């Protein structure tokens, strides 16, 4: 299997007051990475569904919504409707419900990604990898 490398700048480093300009400045990228943080699963809070919907209005680049939130399954459909092209979730947030969450993402019409922390053994996600369009190991 060939390795595919994609360039996906994160809007987390952008000036949110100039989001349109910031996204325009990376228009040659393969996709835009959007880190959605809830202040519970991770200590920071970023943005939610509206920011994704607003980004969708100003770019045709694929949007990768990286959900760093508890109970991501509750928000999959809303992020898909907002314009996400990929929804990536953490094994650590889904636990035993991981396969069901990945299937829910697929059934919502978007591509799914799986994220693991560096200390999570790959064996924990081996059987779910075939369900995924992308796998990300945090750094």
Model-derived features: where do they sit?
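Conserved N-terminal beta1-alpha1 strand-loop-helix module at the mouth
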Residues: 1-88, 92-100, 104-112, 125-132
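Histidine/lysine/aspartate-rich catalytic loop segments that bind and position anionic ligands
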Residues: 115-139
């Amino acid at each position: 299997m060939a390795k595919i490398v994609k360039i996906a700048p994160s809007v987390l480093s952008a000036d949110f007051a100039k989001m349109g300009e910031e996204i325009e400045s990376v228009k040659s990228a393969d996709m835009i990475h959007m880190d959605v943080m809830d202040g519970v699963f991770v200590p920071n809070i970023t943005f939610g569904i509206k920011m994704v919907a607003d980004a969708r209005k100003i770019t045709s680049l694929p949007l990768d919504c990286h959900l760093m939130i508890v109970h991501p399954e509750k928000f999959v459909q809303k992020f898909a409707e907002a314009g996400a092209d990929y929804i990536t979730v953490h094994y650590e947030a889904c636990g035993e419900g991981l396969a069901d969450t990945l299937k829910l993402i697929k059934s919502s019409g978007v591509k799914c990604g799986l994220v693991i922390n560096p200390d999570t053994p790959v064996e924990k996600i081996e059987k779910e990898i075939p369900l995924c369009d992308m796998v990300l190991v945090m750094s």
